[in-house]
Curated annotation (Swiss-Prot):
Organism of derivation: Arabidopsis thaliana (Mouse-ear cress)
Residues the record lists as Phosphothreonine modifications: T863, T871, T1046
Pfam annotation, one family: LRR_8
Cellular component terms (Gene Ontology): plasma membrane
Name used for this protein in its record: LRR receptor-like serine/threonine-protein kinase RPK2
Expression sites (tissue/organ): Expressed in root tips, flowers, leaf meristems, and the bottom parts of the surrounding young leaves and trichomes.
Positions of region (Disordered): 772-802
Matches recorded under InterPro entries: Kinase-like_dom_sf, Leu-rich_rpt, Leu-rich_rpt_typical-subtyp, LRR_dom_sf, LRR_N_plant-typ, Plant_LRR-RLKs, Prot_kinase_dom, Protein_kinase_ATP_BS
Glycosylation sites: N92, N214, N229, N332, N481, N540, N591, N640, N670, N708, N718, N734, N739
Binding site for ATP: I880, G881, N882, G883, G884, F885, G886, A887, T888, K902
Segments in the Cytoplasmic topological domain: 833-1151
Length: 1151
């Protein structure tokens, strides 16, 4: 056989038929070999990308210490996760945001400052250390297999690299809490698989782009805490979770926001500048679980359509400008557990520390952003109180009225109810006593009557507050009626992570903390730990006090306890049994002031309650000596035993062990002897009030070592010797009406002469004027609001020639008179040019905008033209008043329709825009004893307010003419004004300080009903709430002494002014009556009242005929009340709520 060529043999071999499985295996092997090679190359590339990333960023905390070239297993590096092919699929590096080089103002720990932020996206901050910084490296885009990019709470800055928007496989983009700037792109080239985008708390600006709706798989979007502006787009309802809080979003919400919201579960639009109505279409979002719209300026009513939200668990619409009745349909939200319709606590109170004023949009006002409030009509439908899953019902200070809800269903889940500071009437229903899981019940400052139910689980409640009502009967012995087990005391730890799958737990802890530290007695924040607060104050409770209503489970060294029952009619012996179990608590605060308690302070109080921090038993009838054992209460911070009948000497033990004592007042008692030298050891003391006793001896020289002392009141005693020199500057200082001698030392040149008057042996008080009178420091009558101060005998002594004496009294008087005339002339010249420069011309300029904004309908239209016409172009013939803010004119708009027009002095105001913002708040205020603000006009050349017209004139005229001596009429006037001020102070958000309470600002109708006018106008002048930056801060004679010393005003300054008005109403004297001249310089009606009371001559104070006609005891009680309102110590002055309560207790019977 002939052999074949070798080449042919080879071909034939390869041409032989091979089995198909062998062919497939060979092909697969070849493909795998090629793929493995490629994967190896890609994996090596991922490692190099990570190393380049590390090289690019700043890492002062060595977070990336494990990322080293020598390590082959880069998939085990910190923050790196890989798939089965060793491709990097996740980069998850959470920083603390608190490294030393970090410029980031929002750290992971700062989440605790915004407890309601981030449902569905909240994270645990524990275990995070350090922070990466620098620009976000664009090399990260080379990780083409990356599905999760999570770098929250670092300090990355600059714009987000453009390439990130094109990463096709990325599912999670989390850059929360960095410093990223720039805006979101108009178009996204990738991100088709993105499910989560979290850019919260960066500095991203611009508008929300429509291109976001192209990311069809996006479910969770968090853009909160940025600088996004523009409006909320309609497509945002397509996401499952949407967070846009704390941005610059403005305008109305789109009406169609709920048209495509089938997946929406969480929607947070809080802390923006949204206006207009809440869209009804949100009622179509059937899967919605939480809806947070708080802290905007949304208007009108809550949509009825919300009743369709069967899965809704949390609804918070607080701090808006909503109105109207609460919809009954909310009772259909069967899953609702948290309902917040108003809220006095600012959830974003720490916004300044994170964002600052500079981060607000142009023209925005942070104050107005946090001061809006809702004012509803009617009451709470019982369909809401019967909701089966309701845990929190929070509607304080929302102008709700009517009968208190009686049907609370089974209330098995109910834990918090806050309906305080409304206008509910009636009794506390039996149904509430069945709510055994209640841990907070606040019904304070309503108009509730009847007796307290002993079945209410008060001993188990962390907060129980019924203060400021008209409840009567005894305070029950709740302990004998508590059978159920108490839930644990909740304390909010702002740095811990809560279960954010249950938003109600966040609200529970947040409100618990706020309610505890927001008590009127003390801020417990410095002590920390849980607290229990039980408030029965300012009611009509009688009887004796039992043991503190605190369950056994509540006792423990971690718990602080506050008990307040002041302002009632409690009687009996000093309640020593109240301090049982006191030593089983961390700290105890007790207020039983303004009652009728008698007897002695128990000698063993120090052994009963070593944890006592505050004891206020002022304004009672306690007698006997002060126990020496009180000095052993080393934890005591404040002790107030003023206005009692204590006798004997002040024990020296009070100053030896009480190192923590900051406040001590034992004024207005019958104490004798000397001031203990041991008081010089009270180095923490801030306030010392020993006034109006019978103390003798000298002022201890060691007082000059009390560097923290700001208030020293020793007036109205029998002290002798010199006034020690070397005192620190006092906010309040008074040693008048003693027997002191020697020179008057200057306390940094600011000792008022009136504070040392009534000491016949003191050298004459040399006077200088603290301020030069100007147009801004004059009241409506032209009285200059200046004060006389003692000058230093050295610094202010006139130069004397050798051998010559000083100026004689006649020369001094002549110089003083000449100086006064010159000052007045200068003031008149300044006033002339000021008015020439700023005040509008008498005729209305043609360019004035003619819009009049109305807050209510009075049946006839009020226009700019008919106001000008009705006032005769503001003619003097229609002038009915002239004050510091402008002139007031009577205007008959049409037949039987008369209004009062207050034409404002434009030169005083900061601008029309601010005026519009401020007047909006005043226009909402409604109270039976406030002059009603009907409308206003404001332009660059003209401003006026429209008020209801009151034909009875003002109280100043009433007192001068002494129109009546009927005690019932006088009492009603006093009560009317007290109610108006209490409303401004305690039921307005923000609270309104009047700053100029005086008879001419109190108007009367024909039936002698009283109305307070000019409220809120001081704020319109552009002054802050606590600092008076212009002269409009009161009228001389009515100004509180602390304002003269510190230029600070508060609600207690209004209380002082009210007390002066009340004294005028009771007497026939003015605040600075000419008849007081004989008593010396600076003597006023307050000092006159104190003098007569101290001398037992109260009868002489009252106007002729009033004493004979009125009940003597009640008249003296009201006189005492007026004097307490005018004491120098702010903490001793009552609140206006307490004044109202006391006047109601002294109300004379009607005919």
């Amino acid at each position: 056989m002939t052999s074949l060529p070798s080449s042919v043999i080879k071909w034939r071999f390869f041409r032989r038929q091979m089995p198909s499985d062998v062919v497939f295996s060979l092909c697969l092997l070849c493909f795998a070999s090629c793929l493995a090679g490629k994967i190896t190359v890609l994996a090596d590339s991922d490692k190099s990308v990570l190393l380049r990333f590390k090289k690019t960023v700043s890492d002062p905390g060595s977070i990336l210490a494990s990322w080293v070239e020598e390590s082959e297993d880069y998939c085990s590096w910190f923050g790196v996760s890989c798939d089965s092919s060793s491709r990097v699929m996740a980069l998850n590096i959470s920083g603390s945001g608190s490294s030393e080089i970090s410029r980031n103002r929002f750290t992971c720990g700062d989440i605790g400052k915004f407890p309601l932020y981030g449902f569905g996206v909240r994270r645990d901050c524990t275990g995070n250390h350090g922070a990466l910084a620098g620009n976000l490296p664009s090399v990260i885009m080379s990780l083409t297999g990356l599905r999760v990019l999570s770098l929250p709470f670092n300090s990355f800055s600059g714009e987000i690299p453009v390439g990130i928007w094109g990463m096709e496989k990325l599912e999670v983009l989390d850059l929360e809490g960095n410093l990223m700037t720039g805006s979101l792109p108009d178009q996204f080239t990738g991100l088709r698989n993105l499910r989560v985008m979290n850019l919260g708390f960066n500095r991203v600006s611009g508008e929300i782009p429509n291109s976001l709706q192209n990311l069809t798989k996006l479910e969770i979007l968090n853009l909160g805490g940025n600088k996004l502006n523009g409006t909320v787009p309609g497509f945002v309802g397509r996401f499952r979770v949407l967070h846009l809080p704390l941005n610059w979003l403005q305008g109305s919400l789109p009406k169609d926001i709920g048209d495509s919201c089938g997946k929406l579960e969480h929607l947070d639009l809080s802390g923006n500048f949204l206006t207009g109505r809440i869209p009804e279409s949100l009622g179509k979002c059937a899967g919605l679980r939480s809806l947070l719209l708080y802290m905007n300026t949304l208007e009108e009513t809550i949509p009825l359509e919300f009743g369709s939200l069967q899965k809704l668990e949390v609804l918070d619409v607080s701090r808006n400008t909503l109105s109207g009745p609460l919809p009954v349909e909310l009772g259909n939200c069967s899953s609702l557990s948290v309902l917040v319709l108003s809220n006095l606590y600012n959830v974003y109170e720490d916004i300044n520390s994170v964002r600052g004023e500079a981060d607000l949009p142009p023209g925005a006002d942070l104050t107005s952003m946090t001061e809006d409030f809702n004012f509803y009509q009617g009451g709470i439908p019982e369909e809401i109180t019967r909701l089966p899953k309701l845990k929190i019902l929070w509607v304080p200070r929302a102008t709700l009225e009517g009968r208190f809800p009686g049907d609370w269903g089974s209330c098995q889940n109910l834990e918090m109810v806050n309906l305080g500071q409304n206008f509910f009437k009636g009794e506390i229903p039996v149904g509430l006593s069945k709510c055994k899981n209640l841990r907070l019940l606040d019904l304070s400052s309503n108009r509730l009557t009847g007796e307290l139910l002993k079945e209410i689980s008060v001993p188990c409640m962390s907060v129980f507050d019924v203060g400021g009502n008209s409840l009567s009967g005894v305070i029950p012995d709740f302990l004998n009626n508590t059978t159920s087990h108490c839930p644990p005391v909740v304390y909010f730890d702002r740095f811990s992570i809560e279960s954010y799958s249950d938003p109600s737990s966040v609200y529970l802890s947040f409100f618990t903390e706020k309610a505890q530290v927001g008590t009127s007695l003390i801020d417990l924040g410095s002590d920390g730990g849980p607290a229990v607060f039980h408030n029965f104050a300012d009611n009509n409770f009688t009887g004796t006090l039992k043991s503190i209503p605190l369950a056994q489970e509540r006792l423990g060294k971690r718990v602080s306890y506050i008990f307040s029952a002041g302002g009632n009619r409690l009687y009996g012996q000093f309640p020593g049994n109240l301090f049982d179990n006191c030593d089983e608590l961390k700290a105890v605060y007790v207020n039983v002031s303004f009652n009728k308690l008698s007897g002695r302070i128990p000698q063993g109080l120090n052994n009963m309650c070593t944890s006592l921090k505050i004891l206020d038993a002022s304004v009672n009838q306690i007698f006997g000596p002060i126990p020496t054992s009180l000095g052993d209460l080393a934890s005591l911070v404040a002790l107030n035993l003023s206005w009692n009948q204590l006798q004997g000497q002040i024990p020296g033990s009070l100053g030896k062990k009480m190192a923590a004592l900051t406040y001590l007042s034992i004024a207005n008692n019958n104490l004798t002897g000397q001031i203990p030298q041991s008081f010089g050891q009270l180095h923490s003391l801030d306030v010392l009030d020993l006034s109006s006793n019978h103390l003798s001896g000298g002022i201890p020289h060691d007082f000059v070592n009390l560097k923290n002392l700001t208030v020293l009141l020793l007036n109205n005693n029998n002290l002798s010797g010199p006034i020690p020199s070397g005192f620190a500057t006092f906010a309040v200082f008074n040693v008048s009406s003693n027997n002191l001698s020697g020179p008057v030392p200057s306390t940094n040149g600011l000792t008022k002469c009136s504070t040392v008057s009534g000491n016949p042996y003191l050298r004459p008080c040399h006077v200088f004027s603290l301020t030069t009178p100007s147009s801004d420091s004059r009241d409506s009558t032209g009285d200059s609001i200046t004060q006389d101060y003692a000058s230093s005998p050295v610094e202010n002594a006139p130069s004397q020639s050798p051998g010559k004496g000083g100026f004689n009294s006649l020369e001094i008087a002549s110089i003083a008179s000449a100086s006064a005339i010159v000052s007045v002339l200068i003031a008149l010249v300044i006033l002339f040019f000021y008015t020439r420069k700023w005040h509008p011309k008498s005729k209305i300029m043609a360019t004035t905008k003619r819009e009049v904004t109305m807050f209510m309908d009075i049946g006839v239209p009020i226009t700019f033209d008919n106001v000008v016409r009705a006032t005769g172009n503001f003619n003097a013939s229609n002038l009915i008043g002239n004050g510091g803010f402008g002139a007031t004119y009577k205007a008959e708009i049409s037949q039987d329709v008369v209004v009062a027009i207050k034409r404002l002095s434009i030169g005083r105001f900061q601008g029309v825009q601010q005026f519009h913002a401020e007047i909006k708040t005043l226009g909402r205020l409604r109270h039976p004893n406030l002059v009603t603000l009907i409308g206003y006009h404001a332009s660059e050349t003209e401003m006026f307010l429209v008020y209801n017209y009151l034909p009875g004139g003002n109280l100043e005229k009433f007192i001068q003419e002494r129109s009546t001596r009927d005690w019932r009429v006088l009492h009603k006037i006093a009560l009317d004004i007290a109610r108006a001020l209490a409303y401004l102070h305690d039921q307005c958000v923000p609270r309104v300080l009047h700053r100029d309470v005086k008879p001419s600002n109190i108007l009367l109708d024909d039936d002698c009903n009283a109305y307070l006018s000019d409220f809120g106008l001081a704020r319109l002048l552009g002054t802050s709430e606590t600092h008076a930056t212009t002269g409009v801060a009161g009228t001389f004679g009515y100004v509180a002494p602390e304002y003269a010393m510190t230029c600070r005003v508060s609600d207690k300054a209004d209380v002082y002014s009210y007390g002066v008005v009340l004294l005028e109403l009771l007497s026939d004297k003015k605040a600075l009556d000419p008849s007081f001249v004989s008593y010396g310089n600076g003597f006023n009606i307050v000092q006159w009242a104190c003098m007569l009371l101290r001398q037992g001559r109260a009868k002489e104070f009252f106007t002729a005929g009033l004493w004979d006609a009125g009940p003597h005891d009640d008249l003296v009680e009201v006189l005492h009340l007026a004097v307490v309102c005018t004491v120098d110590s702010l903490s001793t002055r009552p609140t206006m709520k307490q004044v109202v309560r006391r006047l109601k207790q002294l109300q004379p019977p009607s005919c």
